[in-house]
A protein has these predicted regions:
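Metallocofactor- and cofactor-centric catalytic cores in central/energy metabolism, strongly enriched
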Residues: 1-409, 416-496
């Protein structure tokens, strides 16, 4: 079993694949270094002398600079490494010399649902979407009272509550409206009840304008203040929606019609070595099959955005990527926050030292394929291949944004563990085997086998594709079995 990994030949650190005790001789890639102190799993150890102020190189890229001289064998972490990041950057388009679509592969099929508008779906559910937080508990009771309607090919009745829809103005109000309308359009929802109170800022007329044309058999509306008994009214509407949703049956659909979101949270020092590269390889495989993948978490691209921007398929896509990156930095600065105020305490405990360190691991999920498009918050994926989406690093907010963009399911890598799920089925992918063994009720797929030397990244990615096809065909994720699913909406302004 390998002790450590030397990710790039030019790196001056290695990453411990397992805990390394002080005095242990570590041999990797022709290097032989004795650990001068204990090195926890996922943490970095110097393999060359590093002077005070000299860059610490990991992934072949500076992830910060040393704040003290370090001899080979030294533990390199927050106590002796600091970020190099600052504010906005003026980028230039330098497309990678090997920038080209990957060779095509005949797509496999999954057993999904074909909607009347031609779109594919992997779940056949009824959703209740509240337009305002005031009706959250009403929506929950409607779900509880009508579970008997979940029969035949109908796979669930769910609501996605939130605190917004009123006391918001301007951009926040528009984002809430746009996000909720996007959820109503999601193909995994066979039928939708849009539930409102009646006096909120987000009026029925505004929502209809945002939603645009819709199937009146698929989407129904209920305003609680307009009826004597909202529960009786909802029952009648939900019966109609159930009759509509029950018409759909699973049938073979090519994998090329899938949209898959890619996310990491509770990352550790192995995230960029096991789970995220596996997801990246999977993303490339999806692109080869004509499918679509979505990468977000813009603040966790800071410091590594150049890797992605050089892969933009053309200058127009590059300009959109540049605007997205610097726009998010402006958002931080406008709130008097530094752009590098990341990683989290859990990230640091797992071995991630700086935002560049975290970002270099994060962008591994993007694989090697060209970036075909950059899309805004609440906008749908319209281009096959790899897409970048405007959204924060926050797990719930970014996963909700990917669902709203049309992701049928989400791949979520984690080194620390998390139980949550978006409305779209969310597969948890562990970076290390101890986590998979400890939290077997949370984790769907273990890439710790790569660190254990049992499988290669290519082998793990093929296994992951097989799992995605099974989940798309109806196999439940761990979170689905527990009934976990929720949303969180991005906000930036005042609450009235």
């Amino acid at each position: 079993m390998p002790q450590a990994i030397h990710i790039s030949p030019i790196d001056n650190v290695v990453v411990a694949l397992h805990p390394i005790a002080k005095g242990t001789l570590v041999e990797v890639d022709g290097l032989a270094v004795t650990a001068l102190e204990d090195i926890p799993q996922g943490h970095k150890m110097a393999v060359k002398p590093i002077k005070n102020g000299e860059n610490v190189i990991k992934y072949g890229f500076p992830i910060g600079h040393a704040t003290a001289d370090a001899e080979p064998g030294t533990w390199m972490h927050t106590h002796n490494v600091h970020t190099n990041l600052s504010g906005e950057v003026e980028y230039s388009y330098n497309p990678s010399p090997d920038l080209a679509p990957l060779p095509k592969v005949e797509p496999e099929t999954f057993m999904g649902f074909r909607r009347k508008d031609g779109r594919a779906a992997i779940r056949n559910e009824i959703w209740i979407i509240p337009t305002v937080g005031c009706v959250n508990d009403i929506a929950k009771k409607m779900v509880a009272d009508n579970q008997d309607l979940v029969t035949g090919t109908i796979e669930g009745l769910y609501t996605f509550t939130h605190p917004f829809g009123c006391s918001q103005t301007g951009h926040d109000h528009a984002q809430t409206r746009k996000l909720l309308a996007a959820l109503v359009r999601h193909p995994n929802a066979a039928a939708v009840l849009v539930l409102s109170l009646g006096c909120e800022n987000l009026t029925h007329e505004q929502f209809l304008e945002e939603l645009g044309e819709y199937d009146h058999d698929r989407v129904k509306f209920l305003t609680c203040q307009d009826v004597d008994d909202e529960f009786t009214a909802a029952r009648d509407i939900l019966k109609e929606l159930a009759a509509y949703a029950g018409q759909f049956k699973r049938e073979p659909i090519p994998v090329s019609e899938l949209v898959v979101g890619m996310k990491c949270g509770g990352s550790d020092g192995l995230s960029g070595i096991t789970a995220n590269p596996t997801i990246g390889r999977f993303s490339d495989m999806m692109g080869q099959r004509g499918g679509s993948t979505v990468l977000t978490e813009v603040p966790e691209m800071f410091g590594a955005e150049g890797f992605l921007m050089d892969r933009c398929i053309d200058r127009d896509v590059f300009v959109k990527a540049e605007q997205m990156i610097n726009g998010f930095k402006e958002y931080f600065i406008s709130h008097n926050e530094v752009v590098y105020d990341n990683p989290s305490p859990g990230n640091k405990q797992g071995g991630i030292t700086t935002l560049e360190d975290k970002s270099c691991g994060c962008v591994q999920k993007g694989g090697t394929a060209p970036i075909m498009d950059v899309i805004g918050y609440g906008d749908p994926v319209v281009t096959k291949g790899l897409n970048m989406l405007y959204g924060p690093g926050n797990d719930l907010v970014s996963a909700t944004a990917m669902t709203a963009a049309g992701a049928h399911l989400i791949l979520f890598s984690t080194g620390r563990g998390t139980p949550f799920s978006a409305p779209a089925p969310t597969l948890k992918i562990s970076t290390n085997t101890p986590l998979a063994e400890k939290k077997s009720g949370w984790i769907d797929f273990n890439t710790g086998v790569i660190a254990d030397g049992e499988k290669t990244i290519d082998e793990a990615a093929k296994d992951l594709l097989d799992l995605v096809i099974r989940v798309a065909s109806g196999e439940q994720t761990k979170a689905e079995k527990h009934g976990f699913r929720e949303i969180s909406i991005f906000k930036d302004g005042v609450v009235l």
